[in-house]
Amino acid sequence: MSLPPLPALVVLDVNETLSDLSPLGAAFAAAGLQEHEAEPWFAGLLRDAFALTAAGAHPTFGELARESLLVRAHGRVADPDATAEQVLEAVRGLPPHPDVADGIRALTALGTRVVTLSNGPAATAEALLGRAGVADLVERTLSVDDAPAWKPDRRSYLHALDACGVGDAGEALLAAVHPWDVDGARRAGLRTAWVDRRGSRYPAYAAPADLTVTSLVDLADRLRAR
């Protein structure tokens, strides 16, 4: 059986796939909240975004992030606005995972185009790639702010393909840490790679990934060996 061709386009998720959210706990504590709140805050933000998208709304990441922090800080700190801004500044300055720079270099060395597609602002992704030293290797930093809906709505992935001039979804591969993102891309016709950074179990209710990798470097290695 012949192996599938190298994807013409690799679409990278940003939040948690490229960015390391682990420093957020300390940022929450420094802003007057609790360190353990960082992870449920981010999960709740995504939950509310998905619910609003399903209801027909199209909020921005910034709007939801700020308001959800104000709700969490209400009655607990003297200046909720300052607390929210302090946490958001930490979000905007998150570091990349250690494999990101080498992984993106390895992917582009294969001859495939690399872009990002985020539910967050394009500027945040651009700054993250700059800190990783690979901004010049990523063709475009796409955001659902310019798409009809948040990921995992299929329209967000098709928007990315259209922006990149890719007519056949099967010529693109999405790589993400979130099974819901992998599922959405798969249902939109893209090939997929689940970036399993934690040694987790992939949920059986999600459409399976074509590849399971541990890092972007591993992804490039797997594509090279196809």
Describe the residue ranges of each PLM region.
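Asp-based, Mg2+/Mn2+-dependent phosphohydrolase catalytic module
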Residues: S2-L12, A101, R105, P121-A122, ...
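Active-site neighborhood of HAD-like aspartate-dependent phosphohydrolases
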Residues: S2-L46, A73
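Short, acidic loop-to-helix structural element flanking the phosphoryl-transfer center
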Residues: G62-E63, D81-T116, A122, E126, ...
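A metal-dependent, Asp-based hydrolase signature
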Residues: E35, A49-Q86
